[in-house]
Amino acid sequence: MAPKIAIIFYSTWGHVQTLAEAEAKGIREAGGSVDLYRVPETLTQEVLTKMHAPPKDDSIPEITDPFILEQYDRFPHGHPTRYGNFPAQWRTFWDRTGGQWQTGAFWGKYAGLFISTGTQGGGQESTALAAMSTLSHHGIIYVPLGYKTTFHLLGDNSEVRGAAVWGAGTFSGGDGSRQPSQKELELTAQGKAFYEAVAKVNFQ
């Protein structure tokens, strides 16, 4: 049976959503199906307005209950970084998964990461490393991007770009004005590679 996949993301200025949609495209091109969910916002509208954050995309449902993820085999997730770790919105979501941790509901499921930072050296790799603790506590199997299909992109130093072997990524700029580059979007081929990897598993 084909794996059931959900991409979960939090995006302030839309950069992570752009990556999420590109990852979903890769999964579909590989023959898979995927659902997208937004992690709920924790900032007030007043703060978001001062940050010049655009409105959320209401066509993508919020994941209001972690139980929803129990219905999926794999859930790659994307988020910006805050001090080299999950932002508060993601931390709040994970803090609500105590029931799943207690019952092992996420044990043996698969996940990958894609990350947005403001600048080069802004925490893409440290955020991925920090995420390993949460994934390990849940028994979630991490599938990295790796070099197999991306060495020609990750090894190209002709321009500044996000992403690493841990997963796809982008730089937003301190004010959110920089959009994902063509090369960063090419690295969301991670979606296709992830699907091909987990499709080898016999999900029952």
Swiss-Prot record:
SUPFAM superfamilies: Flavoproteins. Residues 5-195 form the Flavodoxin-like domain. Disulfide bonds: none annotated. InterPro entries: Flavodoxin/NO_synth, Flavoprotein-like_sf, Flavoprotein_WrbA-like. Its main location: cytoplasm. GO terms for cellular component: cytoplasm; membrane. It holds the Pfam family Flavodoxin_1. It is found in: Cytoplasm. GO terms for molecular function: FMN binding; NAD(P)H dehydrogenase (quinone) activity. Belongs to the WrbA family. PANTHER family: FLAVODOXIN-RELATED PROTEIN WRBA-RELATED, FLAVOPROTEIN-LIKE PROTEIN YCP4-RELATED. This is Minor allergen Cla h 7.
